[in-house]
Amino acid sequence: MDRYGHNVRSDIKKQGYEDSNLPILCETCLGENPYVRIIREENGKECKICKNVFTHFRWKPGENSRYKQTVICMKCAKVKNVCQTCLFDLQYNLPVQVRDKFLENSIVLPENETNRNFFLEQMENDMSSTYDKMNRINMDLSKLKRRDPYFKRNMARVCSFWRKNSCNRGDECPYLHKEIHLDKSLSNQNIKNRYTGENDILAEKILLKHNEKNNDDKNMSNKICIQGISESVSQANIKECFKKFGDIKSIKVIPKDSKMFISYSNSQAAKKASDKYKDGLLLNGCNLTVHLQDNPTYNNKNQQPVINYMNNNMYQNNMSPQMMYNPMYYPYYNMNNMHPSSAPYSSMLPSEAEQRK
């Protein structure tokens, strides 16, 4: 008689309604005001994910901010370890799609409402399998982590009446009276896509930027070249001067060419060293020239392979149609396209009359 009978509710979804005193929020959504006032409403709204009624919270993060509210229930937020408002990860402050790509362990909710509610209840009873208990550290994810809150995300919207020159509120208007330039590609974001981590526009933009940065780091060399080395400059002096930019892997000295090559553990350290001493370095009375050593793999990737013309006939017979190379051009004063070491044709041999002369 506790669950049914006299304990009948008007809405069947309210039989297992959520009763919470505080929301699960990130530092950005909570705002910079330490004395924020939160309005609590029991059974105020329906969760955008599981469609269950939950305790709704509403507050104003700052003086020039707009009112924010919770859009998903606490149960769905705990399963994915996300904020109830922006649906960003609480630990890394990143979209779910970015986090799941590096952790390679995503939690997928069933599409059916009954199965989804049962799955959420089981996950709430055993929270050890959720993201909240994950202690796995990913280096790429730590680099993408947003360490400082971004309060500009809470700013008010632009006043539509101000755009029409008809706003009569003046300074009391809670909306902005200035234009802000936002990325139009982020205007069609979806709450469900953000939560499930599928087709998230913002996450795809972050991953694309991360991939471009990694490609630039791979193409950039981690070695610098120092020219003008003399006997007054020792290897210890060079190491003492360049170790502040990063971890040095190896140092190679070529006394014949008066050069020295320093290899760092990453390309960023080599770039810092070359930018610091791009105008030259004076060490022990010796003027040194420092520049970044080019990456041969990156510079030669567009060059064509060298063709061996020693066995030209055999090469043409064995060459596949896909392998097409530009022919070798010879100067106008030498029209003979044969290799110097190849045997001459019979027509090129001198005649008997020429041999008698």
UniProtKB/Swiss-Prot annotation:
GO molecular function: pre-mRNA binding; U6 snRNA binding; zinc ion binding
ZnF segments: C3H1-type: 153-180
Biotechnology note: Possible candidate for an effective malaria vaccine as determined by epitope response in sera.
InterPro entries: Cwc2/Slt11 (IPR039171), Nucleotide-bd_a/b_plait_sf (IPR012677), RBD_domain_sf (IPR035979), RRM_dom (IPR000504), STL11/RBM22-like_N (IPR048995), Znf_CCCH (IPR000571), Znf_CCCH_sf (IPR036855)
Record's subcellular location: Nucleus
GO BP: any one term: mRNA processing
One Pfam family, short name: zf-CCCH
SMART domains for the chain: RRM (SM00360), ZnF_C3H1 (SM00356)
Keywords assigned: Merozoite, Metal-binding, mRNA processing, mRNA splicing, Nucleus, RNA-binding, Spliceosome, Zinc, Zinc-finger
Domain (RRM) ranges: 222-295
Family matches, as PROSITE patterns: RRM, ZF_C3H1
GO cellular component, one term: U2-type catalytic step 1 spliceosome
Predominant place of localization: nucleus
Subunit structure: Probable component of the spliceosome C complex.
Family: Belongs to the SLT11 family.
Entry domain remark: The C-terminal RRM domain and the zinc finger motif are necessary for RNA-binding.
Functional summary from the UniProt entry: Involved in pre-mRNA splicing. Binds RNA.
Protein known as: Pre-mRNA-splicing factor RBM22 homolog
